[in-house]
A protein has these predicted regions:
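Compositionally biased, intrinsically disordered low-complexity segments enriched
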Residues: 8, 13, 26-27, 42-44, ...
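N-terminal secretory signal peptides that target proteins for export/translocation
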Residues: 1-19
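Short, threonine-centered small-residue motifs that mark membrane-proximal processing/anchoring sites
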Residues: 37-39, 343
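N-terminal compositionally biased, intrinsically disordered segments and leader/signal-like regions
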Residues: 3-5, 23, 42, 210, ...
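OB-fold nucleic-acid-binding modules
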Residues: 39-319
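Short, composition-biased motifs enriched in small/polar/acidic residues
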Residues: 319-386
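Bacterial N-terminal signal peptides
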Residues: 18-34
Length: 386
């Protein structure tokens, strides 16, 4: 299938290009994909054994539904950045990258979340070793448009959308099973995203402390059943309470992925890594704070996954203790019903000069109420205005 569209500048042209690529890839998928995609669950896809290695035994292709937990450009920099193989000098240099996470919407019937990943320069992987196996900057741009917009409505995906992902490849790495292209630019390995409901709403974060995910000796709590510990929260939106930063080196939204790490503690010997997102979340807290974000795992291994848990930080809420102040104020009240009045004051009862009090008037228990600073030399009166 081929669609010819007039090339124009601006957002409309981007939409048209996205439509064209979607249609072309749809045709390729029809020709190359075997069978009909079946529905999968996050819980099944992320199941692991005692070593944290994937036990998923399902088949491809499959569909997976969930709430998008981030904007598509919130984790990785997807700006086109072709890096040539150069006889192996740029091995493992993937150039531009793209990643999202989405979480089960109905946690009564499913649990957990899944990451989707795509890189530009697969040709720089040692098992590929060829520029022909990487996306050019133009081809990469088309891929990003294909994934960032719903192919039917042209809705630009954002955090809080309910989406369905069709996967034709998945790989276990870093302690979790990811939906990927298998480091392959062949359209047969594409994953697709479709909109179910826009602005569905982010799930309420699961509230935890470090004692829920770390032992007293500061080791990770790993439970292969995923009923407790780190595995229970992987891929989900959580709120970790009562943290204090030990270092702020990685507290910078403009740093690269590997340089956005900070270490926090609960003050009881437990520590945890926070990975700053590409969004500004404000200055690094100097005291206790609560952290909201996506519970992630980066074990650095393709064969085990019992370590490397972290939080992709999306919000930091300072929890500095507030001091309760008792202020001495003059409280002036008069009935709401009846004629309209203004409050006036003077410092000399023998004077004919009165000044209107402009402080805000609020209604409390049927009484107009206004507060003023206490003063031994200030006198008040009501003056009828109608």
């Amino acid at each position: 299938m081929s669609v010819t569209l007039q090339s124009r500048s601006g957002q409309a042209a981007l939409f048209r290009r996205a439509c064209r690529i979607t249609l072309l890839n749809f045709a390729a998928v029809l020709a190359l994909a075997a069978g009909v995609a079946r529905a999968e669950t996050h819980a099944s896809l992320q199941a692991v054994d005692a070593n944290g290695f994937s036990t998923w035994s399902g088949s491809l292709p499959f569909t997976l539904t969930g709430v998008l937990l981030c904007d598509p450009d919130e984790m990785l920099d997807s700006t086109p950045n072709f890096i040539p193989w150069n006889s192996g000098a740029n091995v493992f240099q993937l150039g531009a990258e793209w990643q999202i996470a989405f979480q089960a919407a109905d946690t009564d019937s499913d649990w957990g979340g899944t990451f989707c990943y795509m890189g530009q320069c697969y040709g720089n992987m040692p098992f590929n070793g060829s520029d022909d196996l990487s996306y050019s900057n133009a081809a990469w741009t088309e891929e990003i448009l294909r994934l960032n917009y719903d192919p039917v409505t042209m809705h630009q995906f954002r955090a809080g959308d309910l989406i369905q992902v069709t996967a034709r490849q998945s790989d276990f790495y870093g302690g979790k099973r990811n939906i990927t292209e298998g480091h392959n630019i062949d359209p047969a390995y594409n994953f697709d995203i479709s909109l179910v409901t826009s602005n569905y709403g982010l799930p309420e974060p699961l509230v935890i402390t470090l004692s829920d995910i770390k032992n007293a000796d500061n080791t990770f709590i790993f439970d292969q059943t995923r009923a407790t510990g780190c595995e229970h929260y992987q891929g989900m939106r959580v709120r970790i309470n009562n943290l204090t930063l030990l270092a702020t080196n990685g507290w910078n939204a403009t740093n690269t992925w590997g340089n956005r790490l900070c270490t926090a503690t609960d003050g009881a010997g437990r520590t945890f890594s926070l990975r700053h997102s590409r969004r500004d979340v404000g200055p690094a807290p100097t005291g206790t704070f609560n952290a909201i974000g996506i519970f992630n795992q980066e074990s650095g291994s393709g064969v085990q996954g019992t370590n490397g848990y972290e939080l992709i930080l999306q919000s930091a809420i300072p929890q500095a203790a507030e001091t309760l102040a008792i202020a001495q104020k003059a409280v002036l009240t008069w009935p709401v019903s009846g004629a309209a009045h203004v409050v006036e004051y003077t410092t000399d009862l023998n004077s004919t000069n009165w000044t209107v009090l402009t402080n805000t008037v609020i209604v409390i228990d049927g009484q107009n109420t206004v507060l003023d600073s206490m003063s031994n030399s200030r006198f008040y009166r009501l003056r009828k205005t109608n």
